[in-house]
A protein has these predicted regions:
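Active-site beta-loop-alpha junctions of metal-dependent nucleic acid enzymes
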Residues: 2-3, 19-43, 47
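Short, acidic, Ser/Thr-enriched surface-loop or helix-capping motifs
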Residues: 11-12
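Mobile genetic element proteins and their domesticated derivatives, centered on retroelements
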Residues: 15, 34, 48-51, 64, ...
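Acidic/histidine-rich, metal-coordinating catalytic segments
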Residues: 25, 43-57, 75-77, 133-136
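RNase H-like polynucleotidyl transferase catalytic core
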Residues: 47-52, 66-84, 100-106
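C-terminal domain-tail junction helix/linker
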Residues: 58, 67, 78, 91-148
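Short amphipathic alpha-helical segments
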Residues: 60-62
Length: 148
């Protein structure tokens, strides 16, 4: 098998999720994920909350500063403060990584499968917390209409 690191971003309001697979959990990987995330997210990012891992230092901190996005670093050993991301991690473990047919022998193949899973999550999978809407439906109905 291959070794990879999973990066994930989750919007507390709309439940919109983005994720990426990288070969290392380094600050440069986190910076790259941030750039990819900002290209995908259909609304303005007002702040970013991270768990304080070393991958969210150096290049990542500088990228947030350069973009004028406030960075909120959670205290150590407080996963309850990051409940939405922890829930997202569980969803990916149960609905994506646990399925053997999604596992691949290359990072590129894993990324392709992950992109499909994220699209399904954001576009087709209804969410109880959103009263049966998908994240994209919620964004269109409640975020983009307000901004227009």
């Amino acid at each position: 098998g291959i070794s990879f690191k999973h990066f994930q971003a989750w919007d507390r309001r709309s439940k919109f999720i983005a994720a990426g697979i990288y070969t290392h959990a380094k600050s440069l990987s986190a910076k790259r994920f941030l750039a990819e995330f900002l290209q995908k997210v259909p609304f303005k990012v007002l702040s970013i909350q991270v768990d304080g891992g070393s991958e969210f230092r150096a290049e990542f901190e500088q990228a947030c500063a350069d973009l004028a996005i406030p960075l909120i670093v959670l205290p150590p050993s407080k996963p309850t403060y990051n409940g939405g991301v922890e829930r997202g991690n569980r969803i990916f473990r149960e609905e994506f990584y646990a399925r053997s047919d999604f596992l691949a022998n290359s990072i590129g193949a894993m990324r392709a499968h992950l992109t499909k899973a994220i699209n399904k999550y954001n576009t087709y999978r209804p969410h109880y917390a959103l009263k049966g809407l998908t994240p994209m439906q919620y964004i269109q109905n409640h975020i983009l209409k307000v901004a227009a």
